[in-house]
Design a protein with these regions (language model features):
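Glycoside hydrolase catalytic-domain context in secreted enzymes
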Residues: 1, 9-296
């Protein structure tokens, strides 16, 4: 076996051994991932295995039409078949979690990510999204060719003002319920293993710290028991939104709102221990987040 330092950055291996890594992204060489996984399972204190995630959007080795093109067929079977093939190929490379499907309702063609979704109609987006989830996850996530799906971006990301990515949105509750939330409710009912929060803020509140979306609707109304992950550094990005003063406040607000996993940025690992000591984040909140993650 090659020296560990040549397989993966030493710092990541060290942190994995210390139990400070919960997931990794975009490792497509099974030999590399197996080494990181071995360390997590055999050498860390709790022995909790890692999950390897990647953007498997419209194919892995075999590339299919973009989701917007698939939606133009008005045939959900296309989305399900493509996702099933992609899951089979990705799982063979050690990937067990994809950040797809994107089920944002999109109306503005200026938005750069419009091609990643299924369009503007909530019924069609719901049906195509559910089909993709079924294709990725198969009959059971325990099957070796199944990977966890991630319905994204919760919610309203496609309504970014002026079509500018990461921009603010101004969506009323009626618009949310009649339009933007419909595909996500369908995804929850279809058993989507994970949901990803959106980059945008709505009326000044970023999605990663929005208790109306993450608690009132997702957990209390829809009884969702899956995992909620932030988008890439969207927790720390709340500082740029002007919603949080610093990383500590970002960790506080995102955790208490119901974001279980912070992607890429490290406000949780830096500040949650102190926030717990100060009584600003309860152990019940931490335990609930851990349960949601371990179920995945």
């Amino acid at each position: 076996r090659p020296p560990r330092s040549t397989l993966f950055p030493y710092t990541t291996l060290f942190r994995s051994r210390k139990g400070r890594v919960g997931s990794v992204m975009s490792i497509t060489d099974p030999n590399i991932f197996n080494e990181v996984q071995r360390i997590a399972v055999e050498d860390s204190r709790l022995g909790i295995p890692l999950i390897n995630a990647r953007d498997v959007i419209h194919g892995f080795k075999t590339i299919f039409p973009i989701p917007l093109g698939q939606a133009a067929s008005f045939n959900p079977e296309i989305a399900e078949t493509g996702a099933r093939i992609a899951a089979t190929e990705a799982s063979a490379a050690g990937i067990r979690w994809t950040f797809a499907p994107m089920i944002d309702i999109t109306h503005d063609p200026r938005w750069g990510r419009i091609a990643e979704g299924f369009g503007e109609d909530p019924l069609l987006v719901s049906q195509m999204g559910v089909a993709a989830i079924k294709g990725f996850q198969g009959s059971s996530l325990n099957h070796p060719t199944s990977i966890a799906a991630c319905a994204k971006h919760f919610a309203g990301y496609g309504a970014s003002e002026g079509g500018r990515d990461y921009n603010s949105t101004y969506i009323t509750e009626r618009q949310f319920r009649n339009l933007y939330l419909r595909p996500f409710e369908a995804a929850v009912n279809a058993g989507a293993a994970t949901l990803m929060t959106a980059f945008n803020d709505n009326d000044g509140i970023p999605s990663s710290a929005n208790p109306f979306l993450l608690k009132d609707v997702l957990r209390n109304e829809w009884n969702y028991r899956g995992t909620v992950v932030s988008d890439w550094a969207s927790v720390s990005e709340m500082i740029r939104h002007g919603f949080c003063e610093d990383e500590k406040e970002a960790a506080l607000k995102a955790t208490n709102a119901g974001t279980d996993i912070e992607m890429v940025s490290e406000t949780y690992i830096k500040h949650l221990p102190q926030l717990i000591k100060e009584g600003k984040v309860s152990m019940e909140t931490i335990d609930n987040a851990v349960r949601n993650i371990l179920r995945l």
